[in-house]
C-alpha cells in the first residue's frame, strides 16, 4: 500500500520540527547554558535559583567611611534569621523567645505567616544586641541563625553626596564588558560618590544563607543551610571620605529640627578645603526624581554674597579711600529708594548697601570689562571646586558627581549695559554659583588667598584597612588674590557680624567669632499665598581670628521673613563647637 504524498510531507514536516526542537534543547542545555540569548542569561544559575531560598546578608559592594574610619554606609546591625521549616521540627522555641524577649505565641505566629525566611532586626526587636546574637548561635540549631546584616531601611548620612545604586543590566554590560562574571542583578552606582567610585565598589561576592527547596517550599536535603561569604581579606574596597560623621549627623539634625525644606549647608575644613559635612534638602528619595538634585553642587543666584567679589576687585584696584562714603539712600541704579543713610565702605558691606557696590562695579567695568569674572576666578567661583586629577586610567577623574561651575555673564553685551552691571554686582541677572564654590571662596579668603580644590575622598582602602590610593591635597589653577586684599576682605567680613547694624549681628554671641556675608536673591517666583520667594544665604568662616571652618547655609524659595538661614547657621556653629569640646 502506497503512502500518500500528503502523508510523506506531514512526516517530513514533523521530523523537521522535531529536529529544530531538539536543536533548541541542545542549545539551551549544552551549548549556551551560561550565556543564553542576547541578555546573556546564565541558565544554570537561574535553575538553581528556582529551587533555592536565600537570605542576603551583604551584597558585597564596597562601602564609605568617615574621616575617622566610622561607617557612613553598609552599617551592619544584629539580626536573627528563622527558616520556615522550623515549624515542622521540635525546635527550641522557648529559648529563642526568651532571648528575643518575645512570647512563644508571637514567635510562632510570626513564623507561621511566613513563606520565606523571617528576619528579625532591631526595628522589631528593640532589645536585640551582640549578646543576643551570641546566645542564638550557641543553640547550634539548624534554621536559627544570629548574623550581622546591612539595614537597607536605615537612611545613610550625606545621602545626596554619597548617592545611590540601582539595577541596570544594559548599563552594567556596557560599562564593564570584561566583567562577565557579575550577575545582571548587580547594582551599580547611579548618583553621587556611588557613581564616581563605582568601578572600585563593585562586589566580588555576596554573603548569604541559602537552602534548597522542592515545589512546595519544603527542604530538599534535610535542614542543611549553607553559608556563603567572601573570604578575601582585601575586598570589598572602602572609600574613606573627609566627612566627619558626628558633624554630618549634627548638621542633618539641625536642618530637620529647623524645618528647612529646600536648600542645604556645607562645611569645609579651611586648612585643606576638605568637606566635613554636606547636606541638601529635600531628603533624597529614589522614587521621586525631583528630590535627587544636590543643591550644594548646583549654581544658584548668590545675591549680596557676590558683593564680596566686587569688594575684592575694588580693594585690589585701589578704588576705596579710607574717608570715602556712599549715599546709601540710593538704590542699586542710583535712584532714591533706600534709607540706610551715608555709609563708609566697610559699613556699606556690613549693612549690604546696594548702591555702594553697583557704583564701584560700574567704575571697575569702565577700567576693565573682564574685572568681575577675573576676580570671581581668583576667588574660586567660576571653576568647579571639586577634586580633579589622575586615577589609574582616568586622567581627569572627578570625585564629585554632576558638580556644576559658576557663571557670571550670560551675554557679553551686558558688560556695557549699566543696569545689567548693577544687577550683576549684587549677584542677580545671570550670576549663579554653587554653595560649594562659595564655601571654597570663604576658605580661600580665610587662608590668605590660597585656592585649593575641595576634596571629599581621602583615600581608597582595602578591606583590611591598608591603603590602595591616596588623594593628595591640590591647589586650584589660576591667579589668586594677594595677601593685602585677603586681609581687607577678612576685616569687612568680620564687620558684618561686629557692626550693630550688620546683617550678621545675630552671630555675635556664638562661642566662636564669626566672619561672613549674607545674601538675598530674587527668584522671580511666588508662593501659593502670593508671597515673593527668595534665595537666602549666609556664607562665612569661624573662628574669625584663627579660621578653621568655612560654612555656607542656603534656604531656597522662601519668603524673606520666614527664612531659616541665620537660625541654621547659628545652630550648626554651636553644634560644631560642642563636638570639638567633647573630642578634646
UniProtKB/Swiss-Prot annotation:
Cytoplasmic topological segments: 1-11
Matches recorded under SUPFAM superfamilies: beta-lactamase/transpeptidase-like, Penicillin binding protein dimerisation domain
Phenotype of the disrupted gene, per the record: No visible phenotype. Spores have normal morphology, heat-resistance, cortex structure, and germination and outgrowth properties.
Active site per UniProt: 304 (acyl-ester intermediate)
Catalytic activity, EC: 3.4.16.4
Entry keyword Nucleus: no
GO CC term, one of those recorded: plasma membrane
Keyword list, A-Z: Carboxypeptidase, Cell cycle, Cell division, Cell membrane, Hydrolase, Membrane, Protease, Signal-anchor, Sporulation, Transmembrane, Transmembrane helix
Regions crossing the membrane: 12-32
Main subcellular localisation: membrane
Keyword Ribonucleoprotein included in the entry's annotation: no
Pathway given in the UniProt record: Cell wall biogenesis; peptidoglycan biosynthesis
GO molecular function, one term: penicillin binding
InterPro entries for this protein: Bact_Transpept/Beta-Lactamase, Beta-lactam/transpept-like, PBP_dimer, PBP_dimer_sf, PCN-bd_Tpept
Membrane topology: Single-pass type II membrane protein
Extracellular face residues: 33-584
Protein name (Swiss-Prot/TrEMBL): Penicillin-binding protein 4B
Organism encoding this protein: Bacillus subtilis (strain 168)
Organism placement in taxonomy: Bacteria, Bacillati, Bacillota, Bacilli, Bacillales
Name of the gene encoding the protein in the UniProt record: pbpI
Amino acid at each position: 500500500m502506497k503512502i500518500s504524498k500528503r502523508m510523506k510531507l506531514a512526516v517530513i514536516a514533523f521530523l523537521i520540527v522535531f529536529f529544530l526542537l531538539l536543536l533548541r534543547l541542545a542549545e539551551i542545555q549544552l551549548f549556551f547554558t551560561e550565556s543564553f540569548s542576547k541578555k546573556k542569561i546564565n541558565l544554570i544559575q537561574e535553575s538553581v535559583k528556582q529551587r533555592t531560598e536565600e537570605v542576603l546578608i551583604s551584597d558585597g559592594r564596597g562601602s564609605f567611611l568617615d574621616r575617622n574610619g566610622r561607617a557612613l554606609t553598609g552599617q551592619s546591625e544584629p539580626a536573627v534569621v528563622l527558616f520556615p521549616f522550623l515549624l515542622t521540627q521540635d525546635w527550641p522555641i522557648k529559648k529563642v523567645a526568651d532571648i528575643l524577649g518575645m512570647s512563644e505565641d508571637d514567635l510562632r505566629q510570626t513564623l507561621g505567616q511566613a513563606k520565606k525566611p523571617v528576619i528579625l532586626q532591631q526595628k522589631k526587636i528593640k532589645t536585640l544586641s551582640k549578646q543576643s546574637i551570641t546566645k542564638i548561635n550557641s543553640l547550634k540549631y539548624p534554621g536559627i541563625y544570629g548574623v550581622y546584616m546591612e539595614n537597607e531601611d536605615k537612611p545613610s548620612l550625606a545621602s545626596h553626596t554619597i548617592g545611590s545604586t540601582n539595577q541596570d543590566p544594559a548599563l552594567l554590560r556596557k560599562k564593564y564588558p570584561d566583567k562577565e562574571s557579575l550577575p545582571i542583578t548587580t547594582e551599580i552606582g547611579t548618583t553621587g560618590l556611588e557613581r564616581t567610585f563605582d568601578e572600585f565598589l563593585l562586589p566580588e561576592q555576596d554573603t548569604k544563607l541559602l537552602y534548597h527547596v522542592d515545589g512546595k517550599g519544603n527542604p530538599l536535603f534535610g535542614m542543611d543551610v549553607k553559608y556563603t561569604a567572601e573570604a578575601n581579606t582585601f575586598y570589598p574596597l572602602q572609600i574613606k571620605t573627609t566627612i566627619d560623621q558626628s558633624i554630618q549627623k549634627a548638621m542633618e539634625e539641625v536642618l530637620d529640627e529647623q524645618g528647612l525644606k529646600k536648600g542645604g549647608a556645607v562645611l569645609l575644613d579651611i586648612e585643606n578645603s576638605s568637606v566635613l559635612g554636606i547636606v541638601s534638602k529635600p531628603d533624597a528619595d529614589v522614587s521621586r526624581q525631583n528630590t535627587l538634585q544636590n543643591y550644594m553642587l548646583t549654581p544658584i543666584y548668590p545675591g549680596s554674597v557676590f558683593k564680596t567679589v566686587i569688594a575684592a576687585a575694588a580693594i585690589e584696584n585701589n578704588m576705596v579711600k579710607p574717608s570715602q562714603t556712599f549715599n546709601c539712600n540710593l538704590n542699586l541704579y542710583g535712584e532714591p529708594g533706600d534709607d540706610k543713610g551715608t555709609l563708609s565702605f566697610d559699613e556699606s558691606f556690613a549693612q549690604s548697601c546696594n548702591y555702594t557696590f553697583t557704583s564701584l562695579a560700574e567704575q571697575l567695568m569702565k577700567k576693565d570689562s573682564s574685572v568681575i569674572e577675573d576676580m570671581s576666578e581668583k576667588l574660586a567661583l567660576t571653576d568647579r571646586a571639586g577634586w580633579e586629577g589622575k586615577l589609574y586610567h582616568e586622567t581627569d577623574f572627578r570625585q564629585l558627581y554632576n558638580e556644576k561651575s559658576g557663571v557670571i555673564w550670560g551675554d557679553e553685551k551686558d558688560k556695557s549695559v549699566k543696569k545689567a552691571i548693577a544687577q550683576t554686582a549684587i549677584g542677580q541677572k545671570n550670576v549663579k554659583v554653587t554653595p560649594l564654590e562659595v564655601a571654597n571662596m570663604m576658605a580661600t579668603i580665610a587662608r590668605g588667598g590660597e585656592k585649593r580644590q575641595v576634596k571629599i575622598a581621602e583615600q581608597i582602602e582595602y578591606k583590611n584597612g591598608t591603603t590602595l590610593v591616596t588623594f593628595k591635597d591640590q591647589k586650584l589653577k589660576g591667579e589668586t588674590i594677594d595677601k593685602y586684599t585677603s586681609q581687607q576682605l577678612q576685616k569687612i567680613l568680620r564687620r558684618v557680624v561686629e557692626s550693630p547694624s550688620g546683617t550678621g549681628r545675630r552671630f555675635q554671641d556664638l562661642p566662636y567669632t564669626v566672619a561672613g556675608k549674607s545674601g538675598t536673591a530674587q527668584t522671580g517666583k511666588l508662593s501659593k499665598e502670593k508671597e515673593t520667594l527668595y534665595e537666602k544665604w549666609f556664607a562665612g568662616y569661624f573662628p574669625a581670628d584663627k579660621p578653621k571652618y568655612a560654612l555656607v547655609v542656603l534656604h531656597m524659595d522662601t519668603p524673606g521673613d520666614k527664612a531659616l538661614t541665620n537660625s541654621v547657621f547659628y545652630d550648626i556653629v554651636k553644634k560644631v563647637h560642642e563636638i570639638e569640646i567633647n573630642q578634646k
